[in-house]
Every structure is written in structure tokens, then in C-alpha cells.
A protein has these predicted regions:
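Active-site neighborhoods and metal-handling regions in enzymes and metal-associated proteins
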Residues: 1-338
């Protein structure tokens, strides 16, 4: 994604914040799996949305109207030894020249620099409760400058929920965001097709799941969440992720899988017969679900309430289950009692 996209987002946010304010947002950190092995790093979504910076141990600071630059990025310094072991770091120079920061400082110096940036502002925009350790540090910085307020130092008087503004912004997608969402969806569609093509009785759920691993990695995408590949009764477990059982002839296979491209995810769930042929009962239920899907999609349009697609699907499913005698009663009453 182009730097202009991130700059536009930051500018829009700072306009909403107003004067004499400061926004402070921490990146995600690496999480240890065992001994010297970390889990794959996944950047904080809000941090990525505003910066595009995909390293751990970083802090974004926005100060509307700051003379020396409104966007400050604290990040790790270049370190040849650490980079030999763990990969390249941007460092302060690249943070400015490549990633678009106006100013960049070493993350290890944040305790010395950030209190001075807080001074003179009325409000601090932050997301409290996400990273407790960072919350404590931020409160410590505020308390530090409060102790010096008697000497005329102006101290911020309130914390404001940054996510209140930010998540409203994220609801509205730009053309570039839509492009990435469509790309993630297209990759996921191909993965589902691969799974359907190789599926047969006698294989194991994990063999089907491997098709998603292959297709995603071939297009530089990651899993958006653990894939659910459940044959037979396993498909009734809402968050089944064991994916270890054999696939049996005559049963259905449910797959709920999605990939992520540059932070934008796809999410597709499909159910189909393991042997390629629906039984009469399977076909009847499948047709109801398909009709519910189509009814929901028709309700996805500007002006409708966000719950309209759900309500349309519920009505079709309830009516269909009554017709199959799997539910008894009046459709409207059953929906009301849901």
C-alpha cells in the first residue's frame, strides 16, 4: 500500500482530534512460543492501519500542528548482530525516508523523550486496556510531568478513547483497501476450489487443510484465523480446529477458512459432500442454506440496516426447517422466540 494512503489516514485522524492533543499508539510485541522460538508476528491492526510499519516494539505518536513534524515513530535501532539472527530492522533513517515518519527515535529512548512530547497538550488519545504494560508506562510518563507542573509545565488533563474515532474511520474503505479485500477473497476462492477438487473419502481433514496452506503461501498470504475443516459431526463444532479425523463416505465436509493480505482478511464457509454427491436429506438442507445466503446478499445495499441480511437469512432458514418438519410452529412466532 502506498505511503500516501497512510498519510491520508493520519491527517484525517488528526483533524478529528483537534488542537492541543496527542495520540499515542503501541505496536504489537513478539510472543514467545517456547525457549528461543516466537510465534509468527502479527502487527496490531490499528497500528498497521495508521503507519504501515510491520515491526514489533514500536510506538506511534501524532501531534497535530507540531512544528517539527506531526508524525513521530519510536522503533528499534539498527543492530547488525540482532539482524543476523532475526532479520532486518528499519531503524530511524528508514522510518523517515521509507516509512514516512517526520521524526524517529530509538524505542529505548522513549522514557526520556515522550514526557516532553506530552507537555503542552490538553488530551491524550490512546487505546487503554489492550497492552497493560504500555498503559502503565504511559500513566507513569503523565505522573512524571505532573510532578513538574508546579514549575509551569502544562499537563494533559484527560485520556480520550482513540479507538472511538479510529474504528469509525476504518468502517469506510478506500479503493486500495477494497482492492486488497478482493485480492484476499480471490485467493481464498481458489483455495476452496482446490479443497473441493482433491476431497474424497479416506483422506484426512488435515490433508484438505493443507490445500489452504499451499494456496495462501503461493500468493504471499497468511491465514486470517485457524482453518476449520470438519467432516461429519465435526462440522457442528463451531470452532473445531483439530482437523485430524478421516473423511467418511456419505458425510458432509464443512470448511471455514480465510486468508489475510497486508492486514485485510477474507472469510468463506462452505459445506459439500465428501463423495461429491448429496443425499436427498443433505440436498434439502443445503438448498435452504443456499436460499438463505441469496436472501441475505440481496439485503446488502446502501440504506439498509446492518442486521437486515441476518434477519432475511433467519426467516428463510426458519421457514425451510418448518417445511421439512424439523421445526414446529408459526414462522413469525419461532423467529420472535429465537
Amino acid at each position: 500500500m502506498k505511503l500516501t494512503e497512510f498519510k491520508r489516514r493520519r491527517s484525517q485522524l488528526m483533524k478529528m482530534m483537534g488542537k492541543n492533543t496527542i495520540a499515542i499508539l503501541s505496536s504489537a510485541s513478539e510472543v514467545t512460543r517456547n525457549r528461543d522460538v516466537d510465534y509468527p508476528f502479527r502487527q496490531d491492526s490499528d497500528f498497521l492501519y495508521l503507519t504501515g510499519f510491520n515491526e514489533p516494539d514500536a510506538v506511534m505518536v501524532l501531534i497535530p500542528g507540531r512544528k517539527h513534524g506531526e508524525y513521530i515513530l519510536f522503533c528499534r535501532e539498527k543492530d547488525p548482530e540482532q539482524e543476523t539472527w532475526h532479520g532486518r530492522r528499519a531503524g530511524q533513517e528508514a522510518a523517515v525516508e521509507i516509512h514516512g515518519a517526520d521524526d524517529s527515535f530509538p524505542i529505548d529512548d522513549i522514557d526520556d523523550i515522550l514526557p516532553g512530547l506530552l507537555e503542552g497538550n490538553d488530551s491524550i488519545y490512546n487505546i487503554m486496556g489492550r497492552y497493560s504494560e504500555f498503559d502503565h508506562r504511559l500513566i507513569g510518563w503523565v505522573n512524571h510531568i505532573k510532578k513538574q507542573s508546579r514549575s509551569g509545565m502544562h499537563v494533559p488533563s484527560e485520556f480520550v478513547a482513540l479507538d472511538y474515532l479510529l474504528h469509525d474511520m476504518r468502517l469506510y474503505k478506500s479503493r486500495e483497501e477494497l482492492r486488497l479485500m478482493r485480492k484476499a477473497a480471490a485467493i481464498n476462492v481458489r483455495a476452496h476450489h482446490r479443497a473441493m477438487e482433491i476431497c474424497e473419502a479416506g483422506k484426512y481433514e488435515y490433508q484438505i487443510a493443507a490445500e489452504f496452506d499451499h494456496e495462501y503461501r503461493c500468493h504471499n498470504a497468511e491465514h486470517a484465523y485457524p482453518a476449520i475443516v470438519g467432516g461429519g459431526a465435526n462440522g457442528c463444532i463451531l470452532h473445531y480446529t483439530d482437523n485430524t479425523d478421516p473423511l467418511n463416505d456419505g458425510e458432509l465436509l464443512l470448511i471455514d477458512a480465510g486468508c489475510e493480505v497486508e492486514g485485510y482478511a477474507s472469510d468463506i464457509t462452505r459445506t459439500f459432500p465428501i463423495n461429491g454427491k448429496y443425499s436427498k436429506a443433505q440436498r434439502e438442507v443445503y438448498d435452504i442454506v443456499l436460499a438463505a445466503h441469496d436472501a441475505a446478499v440481496k439485503k446488502v445495499k446502501p440504506g439498509n440496516h446492518w442486521n437486515d441480511p441476518h434477519n432475511a437469512a433467519v426467516r428463510v432458514i426458519t421457514k425451510g426447517l418448518v417445511e421439512l418438519k424439523l421445526l414446529k410452529g408459526n414462522v413469525n412466532t419461532l423467529i420472535k422466540e429465537q
